[in-house]
Amino acid sequence: MIGLGVALSQKGEHPGSHMAQAAASRQVTPEGRTSIDRPYVAANSDETIRLPVRARRWHAKILRACLRDSTGKQARALALVAPEDVLRTLPASAALHRVVGPLHESLRESLPPDAAGRLDALFREECARHLLVTSNLRRVQELLERAGIPFLVVKGPAVAALAYRRPRIRFYQDLDIVVRRQHFATALDLFEANGAQVVDPNWPYHSEHVAGELRLSTGVDLHWHLLFFQELRSATAIRMDEIFSRERPVSLAGTTVLTTDPADTLIHLSLHACLEGGSRLIWLKDIERSIANDAPAWEDVIERSLRWRVNLFVGTMLMRSRSVLDTPVPDEVVATLLPSRAWRATLSAADRLFPIASPRRRETPATLVAQGMQVDVKSTVSFLTRVAARRGLTSAAELFRRQGEEADTGAHVSAGEERAAFLARVASGP
């Protein structure tokens, strides 16, 4: 038996969680809130960040400098003139944006002792998670290869290895594994037989939305598609067989696994970031590093994004990454992916008025527009209008209670039957 590692707890919200993924389907989550109603939570902390505007602005400048200048000179120059109280709270903002590694490398010696101590603690936690993920990778590889199940490793570890010249500063908190839909049930059975558990076994919910991912207690996110919700998969045209056909090898943790090709990687990073609101600097940095060091062909990015009907998602994040981190995205690429000049102006205005690098407790118009993105501008505006109206008429908790009461009137079905129904829906899809 190959035991899978035990995930560290208290990581803050997880990007694959239903709370976060609800932005794609625009449904009320099992917890009773939509993703656009949740506060931002600092990674490794149960406390929401509460900072005055002055501190947020300083943090934005310093963190952007850490990411724009790998030598750390710009960040250290800012730290020399920054107020001490700003520097003391900087580690919390770095944790929120998941850029503890770059901050630690650039500014650890320039921080006040108490702030340096907090940053060291965060750095050690990230190192521990890194070791857990790499350990899980080797175990997952052995388990799936023994069963003859092809798989891809996406996001965190693969991006760190391929796009970062200094991958040791790009930490990650979980292991994203993609299998073909016909192998999903078998892979899940294997993981469960070796100690894993589904974190949220809400099988009726998973079945209703034909969930494209299950988060396991071992820090593994098991996917059969890049998108969580059937509603968004139906509106777009991503074909996983096509993505698997372009797989390429990557060396990770002393072994070789497969991941997506450069264009598919950039599209996936942008799509994931957009559906999460594009609110973390690390996601924008991943995009920047992928373009700089993993060099996708722009014609492939454009052609696939348009054909898959995800061009608005991709274009929005490319434009945001360019604005925040000077990512080298050609104007013609942005204009092709976002053909409406008025829409580009709207996105630019939102990003300018509500800068992503400035840590905030709650979503802003800039993050809401990204989370609410649909396959075209008209649908996006319509959805955002409905969200605004819903917020004015009823609370998410009240809506959830009514839905829960309606659901309770149905006949009881065992958890095993509900699980089987979900897996059958996954296996029988197009």
Residue ranges, per PLM feature:
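Extreme N-terminal basic, low-complexity initiation segments
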Residues: I2-K11
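Short helix-onset patch at the extreme N-terminus, typifying the N->h transition
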Residues: A7, S25-R26
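Conserved NTP-donor binding/palm subdomain of two-metal-ion nucleotidyltransferases/polymerases, i.e.
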Residues: A20, R26, G32, I36-Q173, ...
